[in-house]
Amino acid sequence: MPLLIDRAERDQFIQSLTNHFETLTGDKKTSGWLIVTIHVGMFLLIMYQVFLRDSKIEVLMGAVWWLFILGTQPVFGGCGAVRVERLLLEDENWANIWCLALEPAKYIGYPLSKEAFFYLQCFTGLLLTTAVLWRVYIVLSRKDEEEK
């Protein structure tokens, strides 16, 4: 349930994003996969900036983006990009980052129920957020050689 805007406003905003992307590409399916690509690409870029870069500013930028994205979750009652993906792709096969990360569980004999998937997604998100904040703490508290 969204906290900051009501359901009608949220749905209107999501629908307008859907319409804009459909106008941009001319096709719902292409627009849906464009959103999936942007969504996964942003996630990977943020994780790259936070965990693989050693620059304080890059780690901080990645962490700020991550926290901004988490901050928008209550506005949309979940991820807004996933809601746009659902409307554009018009099918029941989810293609967001969590589904791609947790999909292999069914191939090793552990198909996830919707409830178990939700709890695992929340746990993974909390774990990732803790790791991001820990990385920021480590990088910002480190003394650079030029400061010594």
Question: PLM ranges: what are they?
Answer:
Residues 107-129:
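Individual transmembrane alpha-helix segments
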Residues 89-114:
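Extracytosolic (periplasmic/ER-lumenal) interhelical loops and adjacent juxtamembrane/interface segments
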Residues 56-86:
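Hydrophobic alpha-helical membrane-embedded segments
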Residues 2-44:
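Cytosolic-side membrane-entry/anchor segment at the start of a transmembrane helix
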Residues 36-47, 121-129:
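Core segments of transmembrane alpha-helices
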Residues 128-143:
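Membrane-water interface at the C-terminal end of transmembrane alpha helices
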Residues 147-148:
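Non-transmembrane, juxtamembrane loop and terminal tail segments
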Residues 46-54:
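Hydrophobic alpha-helical transmembrane segments
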